[in-house]
Amino acid sequence: MNLKNFIVDKIKRTDIYQNKKEEAYYSSRSNMLSMLTPDEKSSSKRHVYFKKSKADEYNKMFGLINITIRFGNRFQTWIDTGLYFSNIYALEDNTTPDYELILDNSINDLINRSGNYNNSVSYEVQIMLRGILSYIDRIVEEIQEAILTLKDTADIDRLNNTKTYFLRMKDQKCSSLEEALQRILFWSSLFWQSQHTLVGIGRLDKVLARYKLDIPESVQIIGDFYSEMHRYFAFKSSGKLLGDTGQIIVLG
């Protein structure tokens, strides 16, 4: 790194620089954020600034995200719209995560795979994945607390299913259509939360082909998945074009 790049890097790591970026973000997104529904809006603004490493920044984010549990829903997904995640360098946007990787592997599987590469990148990946494990523990605790407040059997059953799906993310691969869609929603939310935009869904037919799709409720399950994807559409919208979320599903 030459002297100029070294100085620029140091400046970008300062609170002053990142605060200016945060102010510019909220200014440019004010119209979109004003269109959030009441349950999508955050009651407070907080931020996670880049300091030492990206893995540390992500882990701080995982610890600060406000978890929103919605009773009566088949799936649970949320974005903490009041939590700003600082990116001091350009992001790769308009991309589709490798959902097959997270459906066919648990987080512990991914940690073990990453451990096969003895380099700084694999070390950072392992730190971040362990942070996700801690985040899932928080989610499970929130779901369990929500269950204790309920009396409706159907709502309790739905949340118990969701709790099981989150627990299985830690050490098991997906085994059903519903579980796979919940896992896709969760991992997609991590990209949105960290300021990525135009997060695609990809070849959903190929990704889901391994699961039993001819069950009577499969149409309803997929419909509920679409409804969850539509949540936070104002937050997800790119630029000034409302609805341009990039959540494109490719078939065939």
Where are the model-predicted features located?
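Long, non-catalytic protein-protein interaction scaffolds
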Residues: M1-N116
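N-terminal leader/propeptide and maturation segments of large enzyme subunits in energy/redox metabolism
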Residues: Y89-D157
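Mature, well-folded catalytic/scaffold domains that follow N-terminal targeting or propeptide regions
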Residues: K41, R70, E141, I147-G252
